[in-house]
Amino acid sequence: MSDKNEGYKVIADNRQARYLYEILETYEAGIELTGTEVKSIRAGKVNLQDGYALLRNGEAWLINIHISPYNASGQYFNHEPRRTRKLLLHRQELRKLIGKVEQQGLTLIPLKMYLKRGWVKVSIALGKGKKLHDKREDLKRRQDQRDIQRAMKSY
């Protein structure tokens, strides 16, 4: 399977987010970055695992995303790997997100980071944390689907 899908190239994927959270809605957001961060992202040195987004003062912030320092530039001009980065969303999207996060107690999680027409984009999702029994149910359902597919394939 190719990394290129409909004009964008996926750089990092947070697969664990779909296991830990029930995804309700997804949004595409731009991200405010420095030059060395963009170079490092293009090299694929990003970790989204522990990241989450916060809404503060009417703005969205991406927290705890690790972007490794860029090796070609010295230590002096490099960025801090886990700094807080601003997400760029439309005002209407921000209002909608603020309402849902504050009233319904939902969480904003980054699902994937990709390049779209040369710009770095982050796919963020409104998610509701799963309990242990929900995770087990999902695993059981997935296993049952695989068994059904195997049985259908043999006939």
Swiss-Prot record:
Q: Where is this region: Disordered?
A: 136-155
User: Where is the protein localized?
Assistant: Cytoplasm
Task: Supply the SUPFAM superfamilies for this chain.
Answer: Small protein B (SmpB)
This protein's GO cellular component annotations are: cytosol
What biological processes does GO assign it? trans-translation
UniProtKB keywords: Cytoplasm, RNA-binding
Q: Which Gene Ontology molecular-function terms are recorded?
A: RNA binding
- Report the superkingdom from the record: Bacteria
Q: What does this protein do?
A: Required for rescue of stalled ribosomes mediated by trans-translation. Binds to transfer-messenger RNA (tmRNA), required for stable association of tmRNA with ribosomes. tmRNA and SmpB together mimic tRNA shape, replacing the anticodon stem-loop with SmpB. tmRNA is encoded by the ssrA gene; the 2 termini fold to resemble tRNA(Ala) and it encodes a 'tag peptide', a short internal open reading frame. During trans-translation Ala-aminoacylated tmRNA acts like a tRNA, entering the A-site of stalled ribosomes, displacing the stalled mRNA.
The text of the family note is: Belongs to the SmpB family.
Disulfide connectivity for this sequence is: none
Q: Which NCBIfam families match?
A: PRK05422.1 (NF003843), smpB (TIGR00086)
What is the official name of this protein in its record? SsrA-binding protein
User: Keyword Oxidoreductase: yes or no?
Assistant: no
Could you tell me which CDD domains the record lists for this protein?
A: SmpB
